[in-house]
Amino acid sequence: MAKRTVIIVGATGMVGREILAGLLADDSVGEVHSLGRRPPTMQHPKLTAHVVNFASQPLFPNLPQADEVYLALGTTIKVAGSQQAFRAIDYDANLAVARAAQAAGVTKLGLVSAMGADASSSVFYNRVKGELEEALEKMSFAGLVIARPSLLVGDREALGQPARRGEKLGLALSKVLSFLIPANYQPIAAAAVAKAILTAVPQAQGKNILLSGAMH
């Protein structure tokens, strides 16, 4: 059986790093091409890192022929600096990679979205996430997997990211009140999200949504 060629964007983020590790450990994957503003810290014979400026390379004309693409690129409005800058990364850059990947023959796509994603939401963050989901659905990939994790748990310090005050509070409360919190809204490990999406994408047919509770 021919080995799969995979494209990933956002491989230096919390979930993206776990997805990349899973792909590199998978014997059925022959090539992994990562796109990002900086290369992953991981090195592997089957990994090719492409450092890109998403603002100046919206079309990515040189992507290799591939089977799957994983979109794990994301930020926060605080880090991006404005709603416009946030949208440019979470919506524009992810969608540009999806289009380029489809042009390169990709038929299966996995997206790391968020609980609450809704194109009609009054919350800007949720609305952008929902708009991206809708845009990808319209592209008619043979298989589309959308993972909607709740509060992510992982080692931000290892990623060179500051700890987020809201996350610490959410984790503390969830430990005390876990019996009151629905499964879809309980914190989830980034590794669990990666494992779920890596399992679902290769066999996906049509649109599939993975809610946080189903990924634990």
Segments (PLM) and residue ranges:
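NAD(P)H-binding glycine-rich loop region in Rossmannoid oxidoreductase-like domains
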Residues: 6, 41, 47-96, 100-103, ...
